[in-house]
C-alpha cells in the first residue's frame, strides 16, 4: 500500500512514522534553501503553528532546525530516507522518477510523466501546480525579490 502526504512539517514526525510503520520509506524532496523559504514566505497558511513563516529571520532559523533534524533522521534511519533533489527532478524527470520508483519497489508507468492529467481531487496549497506539467525555473523565482529578501538570504548563507 502506498500513502503519500506532502505537508511541509512532516519532517518532524519521521521517527514516529518509521516506528509505527517500520516498512515505510520516506521521500525527502530537497530544494534550494532560498527557493524553499520563498515558497513558504509568500504563502498564507490558515492553520496555526506556522507563524515562523511570516518573518524572514524566524523562517531562516526554522529552516536551519529542519536541516539539523533531517541530518539526525538520516543518522538514525540511513536506509529509510530517500533524498530527491527538486532541481534534478525538474531537469531529468524520467530518470529521477525511475530511480525513485526503484527505491520504492514500484513498477515504472509512463503515466508517471503525465501526473498533471490525473483528474482526482487534490486538496493542497499547490493544487494548481498539480495540474501543470513539471517545469524548470521555479527554484529561481525568489531572485525577483532578492533585494527584499536580504534578511532571509543572509541568515540562510551557511546552507544556501
List the model feature ranges, each with a label.
Residues 1-18:
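Glycine-rich phosphate-binding loop used to anchor ATP phosphates in small-molecule kinases
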Residues 1-2, 40-83, 91-160:
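PAPS-dependent sulfotransferases, especially Golgi type II membrane carbohydrate sulfotransferases
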Residues 3-5, 25-30, 83-86:
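Structured core elements
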Residues 8-11, 32-35, 43, 87-91:
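Short, solvent-exposed loop/turn segments at secondary-structure junctions
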Residues 12, 22, 105:
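Hydrophobic/aromatic-lined pockets within catalytic cores
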Residues 12-15, 38, 94:
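Short N-terminal helix/helix-N-cap motif within the alpha/beta-hydrolase-1
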Residues 17-42:
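Conserved phosphate-donor/acceptor-positioning beta-strand/loop module used by diverse small-molecule
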